[in-house]
Amino acid sequence: CLAERYSSDILIELPEVDAIVGTGDYDKIAEVIREAFKGEKPVICGHNDRTPDERLPRILSTPSYTAYLKIADGCDNNCTYCAIPMIRGHFRSRKIEDIVEEAENLAKNGVKELILIAQDTSRYGKDLYGEYSLDKLLEKLVTVDGIKWIRVHYFYPEAITDSLIDTMAKYDKICNYIDMPVQHGNNEILRRMARRTTQEQMVERINKIREKMPDCTIRTSIIVGFPGETEEQFNDLYEFVKKVRFDRMGAFTYSQEEDTPAADFPNQVDEEIKEERLDRLMTLQQGISLELNKAKLGKTLEVLVEGYDCLLYTSDAAD
């Protein structure tokens, strides 16, 4: 992303850089390396609306038993704090058959867990097929021999359909795990963030998920100190987190991202206030997570063994 956004600046500030490749051109890496070895300084960027051929052979950067599987790239949500649409381009889904083919190849090489990723997985297929199609993709992926678990990251609340929830609840292969960044819980802040849901709509979706998948782990991300956030609005967020009881939460103080609308919003919040609010929110969440973790004591869970160091095994559970 750094290369895509600041390619010209990088060559000036870091003259020791040999080559620059943007987000839409990583399939050209062999060509770029050959040019770099010749002493040239190739810069291949500006094609962030292009979808590289994902069927190219790949080397896993993860342990051999797990693999990330990209199902789409780019984002059309245009949240006011976020630069991703500028860097990654418009939302573009891969074809179902291409994704399944890659999953089959990964399984043949010993992969047991697939982690589906995109900037917005829940919107998968809307551009290709005219409707949200993540449920249809999952129906195909569960048939891939050798795959034990399928985990999905980065849902947007408004695109989590009843059909998707039903599909996730139906198959044991699909982990009961929802990674759903909500970003805030106050409706006015959500509106100024250009988010597409209200607090009430998010609560309704979360309740539906827990109704269909009682053991589902829900993780979220939240921004504290968005421009103009008042103490009352933060308290609204605090009570929202207290009510919903996320299993896991990552919270961050707002930072001004260059060229985004929110960077120029008035009433930027002081850093000390942001940090104090973050501490309060994370203290609340730590207590919630501890209670929810204690509720698992005495239960037997199926895990994927990740390692052994003569003292203990390390592992990852489906939730």
Language model features by range: what are they?
Residues 125-142, 146, 192-196, 256-287:
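Radical SAM enzyme [4Fe-4S]-AdoMet core and its adjacent flexible, acidic
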Residues 2-124, 163, 178, 201-211, ...:
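Proteins enriched for Cys/Gly/acidic motifs involved in redox and nucleic-acid/cofactor modification
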Residues 313-319:
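Conserved small/polar residues in nucleotide/adenosyl-binding loops
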Residues 37-39, 132-134, 168-169, 237, ...:
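Short, hinge-like loop/turn segments at secondary-structure boundaries
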Residues 5, 108-231:
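Conserved SAM/AdoMet-binding glycine-rich loop
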Residues 297-309:
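Structural detector for short beta-strands of small beta-barrel domains
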Residues 14-23, 135-147, 172-175, 236-248:
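Structural recognition of alpha->loop->beta junctions
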Residues 180, 221, 241, 249, ...:
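Hydrophobic, well-ordered secondary-structure elements that form the walls
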